[in-house]
């Protein structure tokens, strides 16, 4: 196994809150998958939830070396938790095609949040 990509991102939670205040659900609609949207709608801390998802997806886009462009979209990366609560990534559409093209066999995700920030790191392995 070799490391194919590494990405990290940090998000100021107040920035996400400001965007939601200005534009309502538009950012959440752009960033979240359908499954994540269902969780976001009833989450006790929706701003923090969205900030963490945004950080993971930015980190994943950096790990792939592409950023969010050329057909790649935030909602093609889905963050979910395994049976032990560990964050995982599920890919759709162009993100899945790119992962297959690069030979990605494993994706490692870590995310954390504190009072003002959410951060995430994604490692892609062959």
Curated annotation (Swiss-Prot):
<feature type="binding site">
    <location>
        <position position="58"/>
    </location>
    <ligand>
        <name>Mg(2+)</name>
    </ligand>
</feature>
<comment type="similarity">
    <text>Belongs to the P-Pant transferase superfamily. AcpS family.</text>
</comment>
<dbReference type="Pfam" id="PF01648">
    <property type="entry name" value="ACPS"/>
</dbReference>
<comment type="function">
    <text>Transfers the 4'-phosphopantetheine moiety from coenzyme A to a Ser of acyl-carrier-protein.</text>
</comment>
<dbReference type="GO" id="GO:0006633">
    <property type="term" value="P:fatty acid biosynthetic process"/>
</dbReference>
<dbReference type="InterPro" id="IPR037143">
    <property type="entry name" value="4-PPantetheinyl_Trfase_dom_sf"/>
</dbReference>
<keyword id="KW-0276">Fatty acid metabolism</keyword>
<feature type="binding site">
    <location>
        <position position="9"/>
    </location>
    <ligand>
        <name>Mg(2+)</name>
    </ligand>
</feature>
<dbReference type="GO" id="GO:0000287">
    <property type="term" value="F:magnesium ion binding"/>
</dbReference>
<keyword id="KW-0444">Lipid biosynthesis</keyword>
<protein>
    <recommendedName>
        <fullName>Holo-[acyl-carrier-protein] synthase</fullName>
        <ecNumber>2.7.8.7</ecNumber>
    </recommendedName>
</protein>
<keyword id="KW-0460">Magnesium</keyword>
<dbReference type="GO" id="GO:0005737">
    <property type="term" value="C:cytoplasm"/>
</dbReference>
<dbReference type="InterPro" id="IPR002582">
    <property type="entry name" value="ACPS"/>
</dbReference>
<dbReference type="GO" id="GO:0008897">
    <property type="term" value="F:holo-[acyl-carrier-protein] synthase activity"/>
</dbReference>
<keyword id="KW-0479">Metal-binding</keyword>
<keyword id="KW-0275">Fatty acid biosynthesis</keyword>
<keyword id="KW-0963">Cytoplasm</keyword>
<keyword id="KW-0808">Transferase</keyword>
<keyword id="KW-0443">Lipid metabolism</keyword>
<dbReference type="InterPro" id="IPR008278">
    <property type="entry name" value="4-PPantetheinyl_Trfase_dom"/>
</dbReference>
<dbReference type="InterPro" id="IPR004568">
    <property type="entry name" value="Ppantetheine-prot_Trfase_dom"/>
</dbReference>
């Amino acid at each position: 196994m070799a490391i194919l990509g590494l990405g990290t991102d940090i998000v100021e939670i107040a920035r996400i809150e400001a965007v939601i205040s200005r534009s309502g659900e538009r950012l959440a609609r752009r960033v979240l998958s359908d499954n994540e949207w269902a969780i976001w709608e009833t989450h006790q801390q929706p701003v923090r939830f969205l900030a963490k998802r945004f950080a993971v997806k930015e980190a994943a886009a950096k790990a792939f070396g592409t950023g969010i462009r050329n057909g790649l979209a935030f909602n093609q990366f889905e963050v979910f938790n395994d049976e032990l609560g560990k964050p995982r990534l599920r890919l759709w559409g162009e993100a899945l095609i790119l992962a297959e093209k690069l030979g990605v066999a494993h994706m490692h995700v870590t995310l954390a949040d504190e009072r003002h920030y959410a951060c995430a790191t994604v490692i892609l392995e062959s």
